[in-house]
Amino acid sequence: MNFSDRLQQLPSVAQLTALHVSSADGQALTTLEPKPGQAGSLVIYHALGVLYGGRITPAAARLGLEWYAEHHADALAHPGKHPNIDRLLACANSGSVLLVRAVAA
């Protein structure tokens, strides 16, 4: 399944204005918003947070990488081009955990 099709299968983020992503020790890493260039990542990170209780574990990160579909391969070929995918790659490879907190509209 490609990225666009996968996004249609995941929970809606219409009720969100943002999603804060932090390290396990609470250090702010990024804020995803429903705007061009971030909307797909907002959907994926939100869905992972819902499935895994607000924690993106290495297993959750690997699932998220599958959901990014063709963009995952592009991120591997061009490190730094897709920072939200790079973050999941780092989580999956390092064993670290990310925390996500949704901000409702």
Predicted regions and their residues:
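Short, compact, well-ordered microdomains
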Residues: 62-105
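N-terminal, charged low-complexity regulatory/assembly segments
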Residues: 3, 28, 32, 43-47, ...
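Intrinsic-disorder-associated interaction segments
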Residues: 9, 37, 41, 57, ...
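Surface-exposed polar/charged interaction patches
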Residues: 10-16, 54, 94-98
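Short, charged, surface-exposed loops that flank catalytic or proteolytic processing sites
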Residues: 55-63
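Amphipathic alpha-helical interaction modules
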Residues: 20-56
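N-terminal secretory/membrane-targeting helices
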Residues: 1-4, 64
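Short, charge-rich, low-complexity alpha-helical interaction segments
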Residues: 3-27
